[in-house]
Amino acid sequence: METTVSLVQMLDARERRVQHQQALLAQYHKPLICFTMNICGPVKDSPLIRRGFARGRQLLRQQFLRAKLVPLREDAIREVTGCEAFYVLDADPLTIKKFTTDIEDATPLGRLFDMDVIRPDGRKVDREELHLEGRRCLICGGPAKVCSSRRVHTVAELQEKTTEILTDARDAQDIADAARLSVRALLYLSLIHISEPTRHS
């Protein structure tokens, strides 16, 4: 059953998240990624949202492999207020920000990802430092900050669009997974056929 959360719960969760970030920075003195989801409305955790979050973590791991990075620390937290993941990395903060923005901008699902990169001194790395545009609105594609501050779109519209994005991403992933399993099955059957001794009549 999906649980709704209050503003007080969200504020408490934000405070705990900041405290966790500060503890990691104090312990490692290295940049970190704080990954959460941009989910509008009172429901912040559901099987569909968790699927989207898991995909985001998978994409981050792929980027780590490409960059030959192994996180010094990786923490994952699941609360009624939403999923959170923290990655401490021994790398240049701007380099990290570049691949997180690549993930955020690559697909519709990425627009629901909030991958903050935090320097050892606690300052966030801004997109502007990489000469990148700000985040775009889910619905109209305009500047997200403008639409949010002016409340251009209703909560219902944002929730509907969010569900659409999460559902499409889940379905696409299921199709891709099924295709990979089919290829593996065919390969397995072909190997069995090749390994079978030839019978002569």
Regions found by a protein language model. Give the residues of each.
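A broadly conserved sequence feature marking short terminus-proximal activation segments
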Residues: 75-126
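Flexible, glycine/charged-enriched surface loops at secondary-structure junctions
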Residues: 70-71, 172-176
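Non-transmembrane, aqueous-exposed alpha-helical and coiled segments at domain scale
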Residues: 41, 63-74, 82-84
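Short, compositionally biased low-complexity segments
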Residues: 25-36, 70-78, 195
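Hydrophobic alpha-helical segments with strong N-terminal bias
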Residues: 18-20, 70-72, 98
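Single conserved hydrophobic/aromatic residue that forms the stacking wall/gate
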Residues: 192-201
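Long, contiguous binding/interaction regions
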Residues: 1-61, 104-174, 182-188
